[in-house]
Amino acid sequence: MTTRLGSVLHVPEYNTLEEIDAARQALEASLDGYAAPAAFGLGVATRGPSGDILDVWYPQPNLDAHRFVASALAHATGHRSGTSTAPLDTAQLDAVVETLAPAEACTTMAHPNLAAARLIRRMVDAPPPRGGERVVVAAFIGSLDDDPIDAIDAYLRLHLLSTRLVAPHGVSVQGIFGKLTNVVWTNHGPFEVGGFELARGQLRADGLDVVVNGVDKFPRMTDYVIPSGVRIADASRVRMGAHLAEGTTVMHEGYCNFNAGTLG
């Protein structure tokens, strides 16, 4: 039986690609002024005590794909067009999962975004990161030519590069340094520079060893993305946002910056 909740069409399950596309069209039609983004993602951010976003992990970045997922996120967050970011509370995240879940009945395609949303939902209930609080976020990039608007947006662009969805210079990173915060990168996650010595002392008082991998605006790529078919002798030599084609080897004295790399 088909039911309608608010302005969103709901059915028990979508068994075919055609049914998923019909649900997508109905959802998009319910969003006044909606325009599908060029790229989008649902992620988990670490927000420091000052309110700065220290990092964001996107388990499933998307480029020109999964429009049903994009419209579900837009419905939950209020996004309609252009480039924007938004936090999601638990109710909003649950609504996204509820909207996407009927598509799981279609076995002719994978559902990586639904799996990612469920994983993120589990993370919401996990102990908070040592360096701040965990925040669920969504990012929409209207055009790859749009410049980054904040750290949440910037991290989606870095993920697009490191997951090989875009090649170097395939998405604007103009002004990205100004959108990111200088961060202490440790084996216990990211920390704000200010107040880190006290945080380190508290960790040691808990009997934990603290390893600082760097103090920079960009983390190591391998802490967020591991591309297939590559070898990296020293993870600290490859910045998040690097693009490493399959077959690439980065030796100990090699280095790869963000928005750079190999094409195969």
What are these regions (language model features)?
Residues 1-223:
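Terminal amphipathic alpha-helical/low-complexity segments used for targeting or macromolecular assembly
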Residues 225-264:
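Structural signal for interior beta-strand "rungs" in well-ordered beta-sheet cores
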